[in-house]
Structures are given as structure tokens and as C-alpha cells.
From Swiss-Prot:
Name of the protein described by the UniProt record: Exportin-T
GO process annotations (BP): tRNA processing; tRNA re-export from nucleus
Source organism of the structure: Podospora anserina (strain S / ATCC MYA-4624 / DSM 980 / FGSC 10383) (Pleurage anserina)
Task performed by this protein: tRNA nucleus export receptor which facilitates tRNA translocation across the nuclear pore complex. Involved in pre-tRNA splicing, probably by affecting the interaction of pre-tRNA with splicing endonuclease.
GO cellular component: cytoplasm; nuclear matrix; nuclear pore
GO molecular function, one term: small GTPase binding
Keyword tRNA processing applies: yes
Amino acid sequence: MDAQIENAIEVAWNPSSSQELKGQAFEYLNQLRVDPQAWQVCIGLFTRSPPASEVVRLVSLEIINNAVHSEALDAASLVYLKQSLLEYIGRTYTSNTQSQVDPAHLQNKLTQTLTYLFVFLYREHWSSFVQDFYAIAQNDNLPGVILYLRILSSIHDEIADLMLSRQEQEAKRNSDLKDLIRERDMAKIATSWTDILSRYSNQHDGVVEMTLKIIGKWVSWIDISLVINQQMLGLLLPLVGRSNASGGEDKVRDIAVDTFTEIVSKKMKASDKIEMINFLQLREIITELLASPPLNEWKGTSQYDTDLAEVVAKLVNAIMSDIVRVLEDGKVDNDTRAKAEQLLQYFLPSLLRLFSDEYDEVCSTVIPSLTDLLTFLRKVRTLPATYAEMLPPILNAIVLKMRYDETSNWGLEDEQTDEAEFLELRKRLQILQKSVAAVDENLCMEFMSNLVGNMFSTLQQQGSQMDWRDLDLALHEMYLFGELALPNMGLAAKSQPNPVAAERLALMMSKMVDSGIANYAHPAILLQYMEICVRYHSFFESHQNYIPRVLENFVRLVHHEHVRVRTRSWYLFLRFVKTLRAQVGNVAKTVIESISDLLPIKAEVPSNDADDDMSSDESDHSADAVFNGQLYLFEAVGCVSATSATPVADQALYARSVMEPLFSDMSVHLERAKAGDAQAILQIHHIIMALGTLANGFADTPLGHTKARAQPAQEISAEFTRASEAILIALNQLNTSDEIRAACRSAFSRLLGVLGSAVLPQLPQWIEGLLSRSSSKDEMAMFLRLLEQIVYNFKGEISNILDLLLTPLLQRVFGGLSEPINGTDDEIQLQELRREYVSFVQVIFMNDLGGVLVSAANQGNFESLVSSIFSVAKNLNHGNLVASRIAFNVLSRMITQWGGPDIITPGENPVATGPPSPTIPGFEQFMLSQFHGVCWDVLQDGGFRPSSDATSRQILNEIAGIQQAIWMKTADLYINHVQNQLGQDSNDFLRTLTTTTARKPLVDWFLALLKGRK
């Protein structure tokens, strides 16, 4: 069998074997994995002499490992396997001849096998495990030492690695094994570490590295005194202090520092932790490391050792976090607290040195502990002088770290990744600065004020010679200053601004505008300038004399040669004029003339091979990005044109001057678009979007806004009616295009704000175009949402138009509701359409337009309408519950609208005042047979769970209201109907229904009924 297994392995891993043979070989090997006897053959293949090929031995060990790990072997078999491997190891690893030992990948697999054997045998059948392998590591036997260290590392990974999730039984087993190791062998293992370090510190760095890594792993779960002693310290300190004359990387030194970090990170009592930090002489170690050539003399050169800086930063971060944790502990004794405060003073300079390191990776490493420190200081009620003195150097380090370094070149394509990483670091630093402000707001205010003030003074002296990085830093701080000066910003939200900070900010803004910084050459500064103007737009409300100058700068910068400045400025220009439209004055003519060269639209169809993974600068060059930016300009034109300072006639003139070229362009491209030309279709799409966006700028208050809307001026409405007509022509001829319909729908929603009631006569055309046979359910839902807004805003004028358009509208919607479903996306769209449909009908009732639904023009749809509402109400599928609730509310409103007056009211002995008199003949019977029935259909649905679902509870509340309403409209007719349906079970229900107007008792009755049916 051994020859058969060996042959199968050779065939399976032989590149020249046929696929058929390989398949047979792998199938055979897979069978071996579940064969309870295969491991015995495999151990022979692994240990035999002369040895089999490496692949045969490796696969043999895998099969053995699988058998051991799956617990397929009994104790006797495990002991036999142990003896076989020990004999093999005795032959192979007891000689100091590297040539005969296994290669690394086989050693790894062998180590795994031995680790599994340790797990199952150490307790009872192999108590000498550690001693057996340590014995092999004696007498300078390097192969034995390496195998011993591999095994120790593997044992930790198997039983003590906290990063691995384990089953409860396995976790208990591992815990027991750790206890057993501590009891039997931990002292021996610790002794072996000192022995190996003593022997190999100046001979074999690989062995030293392995030993240090193992100490770092094991220290988290062993008695710390086994590691923290003079002998071990005497071995570790020289390794930490090793110097490399060549200035190259020293892995041993770095790992030794990491070992100290692991030791420091061990959980222990506060007093013990402080004593340990002192005993380990960590202050001296870190001071010497930071003063060593790799981190001091070679700073700023290619020899600077970033790896060493990072491991030292990890150590300092661990120490500082532990010190802060001790200080936060209210139960710590005074002596320990005093020592911790002294250590805090000792280590803070080292922390700030590493935080200020030119390499951001080093800085990021200590941010967690600095965050911990600032969080602790925020909790201290009255800051002692020793703590207060820490804040200025911390703040200074934070702010200086926000500066672009000397090697950075803003905006270059090949440095975009570095810049993105720096900006991400800036965000983290900003949080730290906020934390400092939360501790001492006045300190931050003074520091930032001085920094910005000094910057403007330097700019006045040096002008264009000033380093852009210093300007950028000061402007960035000015941007952040608002979190001190403005309300509801910063870590501690305030309802009122800080008056001193607000005054300082106003002074900064005045200096900035007066400084001429908008003419500075560097694009980063120009972007900061515009961002600040937009952020602090409220400054210009009280300093309107600055607006013309800033507006002139914006108009100039929207033409800037740098693509990032240019495209970003289009958005910022819109933000600026939109927030200050009441203050900018009559400047539209000048603005339009100045930016008219940026308004012509040139649609470009993206190529199929366009790079989806382009950088931000490249995407700014794309035609699509340029067009999106142009839309900001069109809206900005609308904003500056529609100011209160601009006569209405001029507003209309400006609108016409911008739209006429668009109309002409649309006419030119329409025929080509009808013929299917992709570029022409995209051009018309862009033109429609531009017209809608221009209208959005003119509209002072968006449609649907809760603020009362004024009817737009007739001159403005007339101009945009022309735009609406032009769009409708395009929609009529191109409505099979998804892109065109999407653009038209967007434009329609924006035009509503400037058309006012002039849109109403056009509604049938909009419905015809936007609800074509090509329209998706999603499009129908979005259009219904727009119609809801129109009904709400024009309820006094829309009745006749609604009467005219309702039948074709409902027929389109009914068609969408009845379409077959294909896939999850289709189901989601159908749910949305159901919800918007019943919401639309609800809005009709809420705005007293219910009569339209049963008018002469629409009564033919009445049955379909009610039937569709029933269908939505009864659908309790996931995602449809909200629509069901609205549908039941619609039914309730139908009863109120058409059920006639109440003829009975709840009480002890209610008496009807007369027969039912519905406004629609026969509606009382319709309510009893249909409305009442749909309620009970839902109550009997097994998926209806109002006791556990909030929306279902709301549906139940609507059902209770409907039952009460039907009874109050029909009195005895309802009672007889219920008694015929429920028999004697109806008595309790009717008593609950007829004695009170409150819904809750009836809801509770229904809940009890449903609970009893389970």
C-alpha cells in the first residue's frame, strides 16, 4: 500500500501527468484522508530512510495531521505516532549538520503534527514533551534549537492566540493546557529562553529573532516574573541597544523593542504596571533609541530608520496608554498615582517627538495614546498646572503635523495617493485638535488666532514668495476656527456662538479678503480661499461691502487653468451666490457675460474602453464631470438672476438670454437624436438637464417646501413655459430613451417652482410622455411622487386638470401594478409603485379632491380603483406593510367621503337617528360586503403579526377605525351583517365596538382574538 500511496502522490503532483491520471490520483488521496489505517502507511513514508521525495513526505504528513486533528486516532495510536516521530527526530535533528534536516516547509508541517500530538497527549501520555525537545536543543545543536523554537511558537498559536475564535469546549481544553504548562514546564521554558539568548546573541540572529518573538507571544499568559528579572533584562538591553555601523535595518533590535512592547501590554494591576515600567528602564531605553543615529543624526536623510521609529512608537504608545489607564482608575492609591503622573511627564516629550515624525506611519502609531491622554484630560474637572502645561506643546505638535511636508507637490497625478493619505491623516489630527479645544477652548482660540494673524502679516511682507504650505496650514486652521466661533459645531455642540471667537473670525475674514490672497498663484490656496468664503457666508451678510470683490474673484477663478480649481470653483460659486442671493444685488448681467463662455454644452459619449479606475484629476477631465460642473453654473446663473434687487423684466431677459442658445441647440440635434444618434441624444439630455437646473436657481422656494410659496411672476413663468414646451417636444419624440425620460423627469420637478399653476394645462402631456409604455415601475413611482407635490401645492386650481388626466394616469399605473415580476429588483420597484400609488390617492382625499375619483369622466375606473386599493391592503409581504397601512387609511377616507353622515354614535345604549344615506347610492352595502370583508381577510392572514411588528400594529389600528366608521354610517345593517358572519362570537366584539369612540379597546380585542388563534 505504501508504494501505491507514494505513486499516487507522485502522479498527482507531476506536471506531465495527464488530467485523467491526476483526477484518479486525487480521488484516491481524498479517500485516504478518511481511511482510518492510512496514517500508519504515511508515517512510514515520512520517516523511512533513504527518504521519499519531498512532496510525498509533505502529503503524508498532511494525511497524518488530518487523522490526528479529527481525533480519528485512539491513545495507543497517538503514542505509537509519538514514538515514531521521536525516533525520526532523534536521527535527523540531533546532529549539527544542516544538510540532513528537513527543509523549512517540511519543518512547518512536522511542527504542526507535533503540536497536535502535544494537545492530545501532554496531559497524560507525554508529560515530558517540553523536556524531550529542549534536550535536542542542547550542546549547540542548531537544528534542534530551531525545531524547539518552532514548536513553542506553534503551541502558542494553537492554544493561546486570542485572534482566533474557538468553540467553548476547545477554549476550555486550551485553558486547561495553559494551566498545566504553567504548573509543569513554564519555569523550564523561561530558562531555555535565557539559555538560548545567552548562547546565540552574537552568533545567530535568526535564532535570536525567533526567541524574542516567542517571548513576545507567551508573555501575555505566563507569570511575568519569569520574564521580568535581571538576567532577562541583561540579555534584552544589549539587543535593544545594538548599533548597525552600515546604517541598515537591524531586525533583531526592532524585534527586541517589540518584545518590550508585548511585555508592557500585559494586563496587570495598576501598581504592578507602574513598577514594571520603572524596572524595565523604559524611559532610558526610549531616550537612547531616539538619540541614536538612525533616529537622530540621520533624520531627513535616506538612512533614517523608519522601521525602528515605528517599533519605538508602538512601545511609547503602549506605555502612554497604560499610564493614562492608571490615572483614569479612581481606585488607584496616591503613591501609584504620583508615580504615574511623573511617568506621564517623562514620556510625553518622546510621544510628541514620534507624533511629529516626518513619516505619517510613525505619527499614526502614537495617535491612539494621545487620544487617550486628551480624553482623560477632558474628564478632569479642574485642570492642575502640570496637566495644563502639557496642552500647548501638544496643540503645537498637532497643528504643525497638519502642514504639507517639504517634499509634497500638491495636485500632481503621481502623488495623488500620498496626498489622499495625508488628507486622511489631517482628519484624524482635526479630531485631536477638537479634543484639545474641549479641554481648553481659550488656548486653541489664541493659538489659531496667532497662527492666522502671523500668516497674513508674513503674506503682506513676502507676497508671492511666501511658502504655500504655510499659507495652506493657516487657511486650514481658519477653516477649522468656525468650530469655536459658530453655534452647534465642535465636540461640545453649543446653541450660541462664542462671541470672542466670532469676533476673531470676523477679523480674520476681513484680513483675508483685504490681503489679496485670492491672487496667490498656488491652486491649493485658491481652493482654500473659496471654501472659506462659502463656509463663512454669514460674515458677508453683515459685511456686504466685501461681496462684489469676492464675487469678482469667484468669476475669475471659475476660469482657472488648473482643473481641480476650475471644477470645484463651479460648485463653490453656486454655494456662495445661493446662500447670499438676498445680498448679491443686481449683478446678473455682469456674471452672465463673464461666464457665458463656460455655458455651451458639448456632450461626449464615453468610449467603451474608458478607464473606470481613473484618478480624481483624470475624472475631472472627463466630459461627464465637466457637464456636472456646468449644471452648478446654470443654477448659479438662476440664483443671481432672481434676486430681489433685479427687476422682474430683467430677470426674464436673463433667463431668455441663457435659454435661447439651448433651444437652438436642441433644434439642431433633435432630428439626429430621433434617428438614434447617441451623441445627439446625450446632447439633448444635457440641454434638458441644464434647463431644469436653471429653473431650480430661479425658484426661491422648492416645490413641496413647508414655507408658503409665492406664485412666480408672470414674466418668469412665461419664459419657463417655453422651456417646458421645448422639453415636452423632445420628450414626445424621444420618450423611448431612458436617459431622456430621466432628464425630463428631473427638469419637470425643477420647473414646477417657476411655472406655478401654468404647469397644470401641460400635465396631460407630461403624463403622456413620462408614463409611456417604456416607463419602468420605478419611473411611475417617482412621477406619482411629483404629482403628490403638485396636488398639495395647487389643490385650489387642479380639480379640472386632475379630472381630465386621472383616467389615463390610473390606467398606466394599473398596467404597471399588473406586470409580471422578474427578479428581486422588479419586486422592489413594484413595492415602491404600490406605496406611491396609494399615497397619491391618499393625497387626493387629504386635499378634498376625492370627488374627482367618482366624476363623470372617471367613474368608469371606480371599481378598478377600489379593487386595486383592496389588493394593496391585503398584501402583507415583507416590504409592503407601509403600503398596506396607507391603503387602509385610504379606505377609511373613502368611507368618510362617500359613506354619508354618521347615524349612530358609541355609548351605553346607542340608537340610530335614521337610515344610512351614502353620497353614492348603494355604497352602504358596498362597505359591508367589501370594506368589512377586506379587514377580516387581513385579520385571518397567518402572516399578520401586530403583536410583534409596529407597522402591522398601525394597520390593525386602521382596521379598528374602519369597523367603527362603517358601523357609525350603517348602524343595524352592520350589526346584522357581523352577527350573520360571527354568530354568538360577535357579542363581545360588538359590545367593545359600540360603547366607546376610542380605538384602543377594539385594537386590544383584536389582539386577544389573534393571540387565541395561535
